[in-house]
């Protein structure tokens, strides 16, 4: 185990000397596909946008509960962790600003100034994200209420908050102590800080040779992924506990699963563990890549069960669970014509490319990466009906506040 669960309850969760370089390497290249091309995250995050809107009431309830117990400061600071490079992060922030402003107004107080931090790994395409930001609301442009009434998300004419980017991993400290009122992280915590060490070790019982994901893997591989998720989430919680203001709140949503078996990753398994896996096997059989090259690639994603998530939060002890649910979401495939197999195939390939394309290209190069996604598109088109009918995600949705 690369990061000991035994230290989860302590002040710090330690990282082994061997693990640190691997974490740094992954952090230097892991990101959603930047830019605005066909395979970019910007143009393939519609599913995340739909899922976020379905969870809107959970976020609003989190903010309402926070405002009941917090003081009315002149500055309100929010941080979105794992912001990526699409407009979904801006939508979340607009909801926060709107809801908090309404709470101040209901108390007969002027709305505070808002400071928002957008945080992701240094490899993230912050330029694309910040190009989506509307200009800052000028004093002569109208009231906060007028600005908020102008629209939501990237369509807002101006923004009523100061914005800044914070590059770094959320599995460590990012902000000064007691400086953040509300944290949000949507669709990011299922990304691990690293592929578990033993999964790539051919001498280990947990070696995942022949496979590129934990779905349908051996019990030992699944256990290694589970331990990595537990250790990562513990480190995340300890860092946020130091950075959150007393009375603050944290809203989290990540991929989850309904099965008690870690090797049954549900919708994530269909995304990465079936046709994506088969596309890798195609390249090996065709001699495009060597088997060892496939065997050394693993997707660093883990969809936890509700109980696994709850166990880590309780073991850490820094946070009280205000709400924790497993919510059935929709499909990651957003298509206009679900009966069009070619369109479904393209959507599947682009969805995988948007979230894993950078890792694939770093491992086998852009040319062979393009060949991989071509194989994936063809396979997905042949199984379009099954994908449309069966592919849906579950999400762990959680609201936390600092424990008394």
Curated annotation (Swiss-Prot):
InterPro entries: MeTrfase_7 (IPR005299), MeTrfase_capping (IPR042086), SAM-dependent_MTases_sf (IPR029063). Binds 1 Mg(2+) ion per subunit. S-adenosyl-L-methionine binds at residues 82-83, 88, 120, 169-171, 186-188. It catalyses: (indol-3-yl)acetate + S-adenosyl-L-methionine = methyl (indol-3-yl)acetate + S-adenosyl-L-homocysteine. One of its GO terms (biological process) is methylation. Expressed in roots and panicles. Keywords: Magnesium, Metal-binding, Methyltransferase, S-adenosyl-L-methionine, Transferase. One of its GO terms (molecular function) is metal ion binding. Optimum pH is 7.5. Its cofactor is Mg(2+). Homodimer. This is Indole-3-acetate O-methyltransferase 1. It comes from Oryza sativa subsp. japonica. The gene is IAMT1.
């Amino acid at each position: 185990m690369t990061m000991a669960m035994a230290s989860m309850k302590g002040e710090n969760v330690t990282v082994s000397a061997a693990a640190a370089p691997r974490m740094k390497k992954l952090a230097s290249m892991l990101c959603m596909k930047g830019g605005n091309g066909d395979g970019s995250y910007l143009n393939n995050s519609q599913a995340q946008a739909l899922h976020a809107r379905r969870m809107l009431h959970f976020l609003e309830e989190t903010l309402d509960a926070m405002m009941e117990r917090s003081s009315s400061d002149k500055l309100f600071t929010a941080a979105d962790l794992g912001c990526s490079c699409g407009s979904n992060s801006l939508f979340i922030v607009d909801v926060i600003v709107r809801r908090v402003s309404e709470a101040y107004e209901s108390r007969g107080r002027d709305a505070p100034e808002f400071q928002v931090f957008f945080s992701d790994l240094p490899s993230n395409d912050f330029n694309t994200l910040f190009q989506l930001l509307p200009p800052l609301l000028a004093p002569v442009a109208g009231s906060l209420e007028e600005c908020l009434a102008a629209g939501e998300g990237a369509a807002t004419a101006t923004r009523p908050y100061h914005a800044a980017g914070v590059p770094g991993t959320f599995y460590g400290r990012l902000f000064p102590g007691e400086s953040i009122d509300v944290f949000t992280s949507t669709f990011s915590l299922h990304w691990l800080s690293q592929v578990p060490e033993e999964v790539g070790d051919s001498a280990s019982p947990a070696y995942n040779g022949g496979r590129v994901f934990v779905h349908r893997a051996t019990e030992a591989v699944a256990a290694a992924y589970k331990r990595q998720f537990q250790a990562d989430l513990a480190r995340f919680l300890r860092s946020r506990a130091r950075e959150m203001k007393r009375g603050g709140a944290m809203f989290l949503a990540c991929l989850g699963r309904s099965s008690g078996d870690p090797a049954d990753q549900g919708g994530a398994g269909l995304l990465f563990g079936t046709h994506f896996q088969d596309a890798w096997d195609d390249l090996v059989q065709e001699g495009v890549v060597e088997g060892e090259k496939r065997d050394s690639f693993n997707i660093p994603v883990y969809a936890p069960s509700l109980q696994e998530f709850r166990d880590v939060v309780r073991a850490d002890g820094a946070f009280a669970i205000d709400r924790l649910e497993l919510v059935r979401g929709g499909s990651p495939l957003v298509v206009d014509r679900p009966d069009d197999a070619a369109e479904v195939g393209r959507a599947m390939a682009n969805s995988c490319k948007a979230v894993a394309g950078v890792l694939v290209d770093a491992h086998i190069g852009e040319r062979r990466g393009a060949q991989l996604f071509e194989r994936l598109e063809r396979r997905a088109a042949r199984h379009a009906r099954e994908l449309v009918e069966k592919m849906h995600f579950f999400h762990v949705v959680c609201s936390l506040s600092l424990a008394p």
